[in-house]
Swiss-Prot record:
Belongs to the Caudal homeobox family. Plays a role in transcriptional regulation. Involved in activated KRAS-mediated transcriptional activation of PRKD1 in colorectal cancer (CRC) cells. Binds to the PRKD1 promoter in colorectal cancer (CRC) cells. Could play a role in the terminal differentiation of the intestine. Binds preferentially to methylated DNA. It comes from the Eukaryota. Residues 154-213 bind DNA. One of its GO terms (molecular function) is DNA-binding transcription activator activity, RNA polymerase II-specific. It is found in: Nucleus. This is Homeobox protein CDX-1. The lineage of its organism: Eukaryota, Metazoa, Chordata, Craniata, Vertebrata.
Length: 268
């Protein structure tokens, strides 16, 4: 229908009032005219009209977010006008409806003293009583026992030998400064010590002996000769015999000069 209307309208392109029979179209039927064609873009081709379809309206989408609300105007109120503004500096502060959240109360001195005073107290009534300082209790018990023979220093235990143990160890050291493995086992079993304790005692005893011998050698060495002090005027004092004693004949030659013979001549 629309094609027939175009063919009938474009008479310069298709001359003749009748349409060609080859199209096989029925009798012309008239429909209400469509939108007016756009004017030709090129004046040389006036016979060809450029028909553009009507643009479809853009789809309407629902807004994903609601329109912003001016809540700040209700909370803070309208701002001052230009005429009512004062030249005073602006003061920044919290809004009228601002309420600070109170901080949780910290542990007071009473709670801290209670926690320090009872380190082994359980966290809950149903929890078993277990102290976190078990290693300290063991060290205190080991150090406080008088019969254990051990004292605790800063970082290690120090063995305190009895008089009988020291006497037997000194006897063994008198015979041999380096103890054998077999003798070390026997001494440890007889004195109630471990083999490591016996070995350490011999190491310390050898170090002590070396220190004593070195001190004796330093005391027995003769002192180096000391230099004579200089006199007050700064001239060094001669350390050898006087020069006159080295040449005794020079003093006699200078003191008593030898007589010179005089030859007398007489005139006739």
């Amino acid at each position: 229908m629309y094609v027939g209307y175009v063919l009938d309208k474009d008479s310069p392109v298709y001359p003749g009032p009748a349409r060609p029979s080859s199209l096989g179209l029925g009798p012309p039927t008239y429909a209400p005219p469509g939108p007016a064609p756009a004017p030709p873009q090129y004046p040389d081709f006036a016979g060809y009209t450029h028909v553009e379809p009507a643009p479809a309206p853009p789809p309407t989408w629902a807004a994903p977010f609601p329109a912003p609300k001016d809540d700040w105007a209700a909370a803070y109120g309208p701002g001052p006008t230009a005429s009512a503004a004062s030249p005073a500096p602006l003061a920044f502060g919290p809004p009228p409806d601002f309420s600070p959240v109170p901080a949780p109360p910290g542990p007071g001195p009473g709670i801290l003293a209670q926690s320090l005073g009872a380190p082994g107290a359980p966290s809950s009534p149903g929890a078993p009583r277990r102290t976190p300082y078990e290693w300290m209790r063991r060290s205190v018990a080991a150090a406080g026992g008088g019969g254990s023979g051990k004292t605790r220093t800063k970082d290690k235990y120090r063995v305190v030998y009895t008089d009988h143990q020291r006497l037997e160890l000194e006897k063994e050291f008198h015979y041999s400064r380096y103890i054998t493995i077999r003798r070390k086992s026997e001494l440890a079993a007889n004195l109630g010590l471990t083999e490591r304790q016996v070995k350490i005692w011999f190491q310390n005893r050898r170090a002590k002996e070396r220190k004593v011998n070195k001190k004796k050698q330093q005391q027995q060495q003769p002192l180096p000769p000391t230099q004579l002090p200089l006199p007050l005027d700064g001239t060094p004092t001669p350390s050898g015999p006087p020069l006159g004693s080295l040449c005794p004949t020079n003093a006699g030659l200078l003191g008593t000069p030898s007589p010179v013979p005089v030859k007398e001549e007489f005139l006739p």
